[in-house]
Amino acid sequence: MNTNSNTYTVIYSIILVVVVAAVLAFAAMFLKPTQEANVKKDTISQILAAATVEAGADVLDTYKQDIEAAILVDVEGNKVGELDIADCQVYDNSELKRQITAEPKALPVYIFKNGITVVPCYGAGLWGPIWGYVGFEKDLNTIKAVCFGHKGETPGLGAKIADEPSFAAAFAGKTVGKGEILFEIVKPANRQTENNGVDAISGATITSQALGNTLNQWFGFYKNYLEKNVAVCCNECCAEVEPVNTVEE
């Protein structure tokens, strides 16, 4: 065949494209299990951080040792399923994104032996997705710790939602509101309540508001579950308290 002909060029190009595509497809298939394992470990690391559980040398072992239950609930607060703890089954960001529009929803709740309950959130930031995990105290209303992440927020500004320890620390002790706005991240002058929000990051107003909107939306998803289980928790606590004998002998 004439190597200078158009036919040769076309055939050569087609063969080259097919070979490269096959190599890339094989590489993607070969690397997929490793990539999925890394995503799972990263997700669990963030969940553990929100639960204030120090990850050991093996993140998966730490999770299995410290988790008490991993369940799925709907927006009515009813349990609709369980996640496999032995397999370290968790919802990654793709599944969290799907749950935003899913009907009915199956929302993950991670309950740890130290009394912390962790719920996730996922939404849109300024330049890409943002997500996070919120750990609640036993009253299921007071925040113990948070862990946030992002993909593409501006370094030194919006990226501080994940990189700035003081921002995450500001959430400790805050509570979820009871009105239309459950939580907000705005400038101090614009905040409606002191307890149900934190200050926006200076220079990153849009990212801060986006995270506030994301938290507000997901707290809304979990509102019924949190309120129902607060009542259960209170009843259990009351049952454990022995009545005081006020009659003098």
Which residue ranges define each predicted feature?
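Flexible, solvent-exposed loop/hinge segments and secondary-structure transition points
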Residues: 2-249
